[in-house]
Amino acid sequence: MGRQNIVVVVALVFMAIIGLAAAASSPSPSASPSKAPAASKTDHVEAPVTDDQIGTTDDDAAPTPGDGDVAVAGPLGSDSSYDNAPTGSADSAKSGAAALGVSAVVVGVTSIAGSFLLL
């Protein structure tokens, strides 16, 4: 009889984990390049270029053949590469914690209810 209780509790915990995985927020779809905001153009003074520098020396992306209206990211680590990054909403970090808290409560309640049902 005790072994059946363990099986039921494990099954309930497994279902709660599946519920948590299903309720977790999916990653937001990335914005298409044609809808990405254009990087702001600001004038600033750059350090002199040395012979050891590789790649572009400014924040502009390399020219590409094709649509000139499409915004593309600049070199890695440049200021313009961060301008096109998607921003999360203010409560997106809290939503995962709330789902985890609700899931923990559901697991606790279902395991206690399951143990009382099979006693």
UniProtKB/Swiss-Prot annotation:
Stretches of the chain found on the membrane's Extracellular side: 24-98
Biased segments, Low complexity type: 24-40
UniProt feature, compositional bias: Polar residues: 78-87
Disordered: annotated span: 24-93
GO CC annotation: membrane
One BP annotation, GO: pollen sperm cell differentiation
Annotated disulfide bonds: none
Transmembrane residue ranges: 99-118
Membrane topology: Single-pass type I membrane protein
Subcellular compartments: Membrane
Tissue specificity note: Expressed in mature pollen grains, developing microspores and tapetal cells.
N-terminal signal peptide: 1-23
Keywords: Developmental protein, Membrane, Signal, Transmembrane, Transmembrane helix
Major location (coarse): membrane
Cytoplasmic side: 119
Function of the protein: Major pollen protein required for pollen fertility and development. Active in both diploid tapetum and haploid microspores.
Protein name: Anther-specific protein BCP1
Source species: Arabidopsis thaliana
Gene: BCP1
